[in-house]
Regions:
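Intrinsically disordered, flexible peripheral segments
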Residues: 1-149
Length: 149
């Protein structure tokens, strides 16, 4: 009975639908801030190396970077530490950049799924000490992507 109450409380408290999942629910933990409690960066503004002075970036600063369709992008870790998610477009293609300060991992994903451009946010939840992303239009996600990936 205690386990059932804990699961019900977790489901309703966090506001997510966990009826379909591919990871053990017992391994999901509260990461502190709630859903979108850490604001993502949407449509970021970029500076050239010449525009950025040394107060913004140092040569030894870490970045998460990638090249897509011959376009290179870098996202400073000191910015990602505070926002964790960037929704961006590269060559007209939507991408999401995530960085988990807790485990120090950064990833880049294609945000175009099933003919839709998706926007991601911070869920406030962790799986094995790594952040879980949420799609900001969750009702669309539940309705359109109703199969496990």
């Amino acid at each position: 009975l205690l386990w059932c109450w804990r699961v019900w409380f977790f489901f309703t408290l966090s506001g997510f639908d966990y009826s379909r999942h591919s990871i053990p629910l017992d391994d999901i933990s509260d990461g502190g801030p709630g859903k979108d409690g850490i604001p993502s960066i949407d449509n970021p503004h970029f500076l050239t190396v010449g525009e950025a002075d040394q107060s913004l970036m140092q040569n030894e600063d870490r970045v998460t970077g990638f090249v897509f369709n011959d376009q290179a992008r870098e996202y400073p870790i000191k910015i990602l530490n505070w926002h964790e998610i960037v929704n961006d477009r590269v060559g007209g293609n939507p991408v999401v950049i995530s960085f988990c300060p807790l485990c120090g991992t950064g990833m880049v994903f294609d945000a175009h799924v099933e003919n839709r451009n998706l926007k991601f946010g911070v869920s406030g939840l962790l799986y094995q000490s790594d952040m879980l992303l949420t799609i900001t239009k969750q009702k669309f996600y539940e309705r359109k992507l109703n199969r496990r990936r």
